[in-house]
Design a protein with these regions (language model features):
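Polytopic transmembrane helical bundles with strong interfacial aromatic enrichment
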Residues: 1-196
Length: 196
């Protein structure tokens, strides 16, 4: 037990720049590469499928992070929370930004391909929400994850900082989940043409 706590404080458990990059870079690059290949192929069906899959992954991740992990973390000590943060880093730092940006990018190409009126009130609301999600993700969520990552690489000396930033990002995931559900409602309208 004491050895486990010592490892957490010293950034033990095999967490290094190389190991985290080895796990994280594929998560970052694969969705981007797949989207680029689909766009070059010009296959609308694949683009639609990709958008649904990565969008579902993004919403699912926010559901897990914003609800389940936030609930679980409340019952843990700060040292245990920091250990959980360390294990989440490859996914939160690399995968989340990748699926978020590729989902939005694919959605823009889909909207253009479907001939959606960019000046309709529904599209404007959807675009504003997507912009909010992008700003939250790239200007708040990602910098926080980089701070957590940097702190863990330095040996997790400031456990309170790691925990504070992680808990903030979990709350941010919950707010993103709510916004994504609103977007899904509008997406159903675009796909079916039904009235809201």
């Amino acid at each position: 037990m004491m050895e486990s706590q010592r490892q957490t404080h010293s950034g033990g458990g095999g967490f290094t720049l190389r190991s985290s990059m080895g796990r994280g870079l594929p998560m970052l690059l694969i969705p981007i590469i797949v989207l680029i290949l689909i766009l070059f192929s010009g296959n609308f069906y694949f683009l639609e499928y990709f958008h649904v899959v990565v969008g579902s992954a993004w919403t699912g991740m926010d559901l897990v992070m914003g609800l389940f992990f936030a609930f679980i973390m409340r019952g843990l000590s700060n040292i245990e929370r920091a250990e959980v943060s360390k294990r989440l880093i490859p996914m939160m730092l690399f995968f989340m930004p990748s699926i978020a940006t590729t989902t939005i990018t694919a959605g823009i190409y889909l909207a253009a391909g479907l001939g959606i009126d960019f000046f309709s009130i529904y599209f404007i609301i959807t675009a504003i929400i997507a912009l909010i999600l992008t700003v939250q993700g790239l200007l708040i969520f990602l910098p926080n994850e980089l701070r957590i990552y940097s702190e863990i690489l330095r040996g997790s000396r400031n456990v309170e900082k790691i925990v504070r930033l992680t808990m903030f990002n979990l709350k941010l995931s919950l707010s993103q989940l709510v916004l994504q559900i609103v977007i899904i409602v509008f997406m159903a309208h675009f796909a079916t043409g039904g009235s809201l």
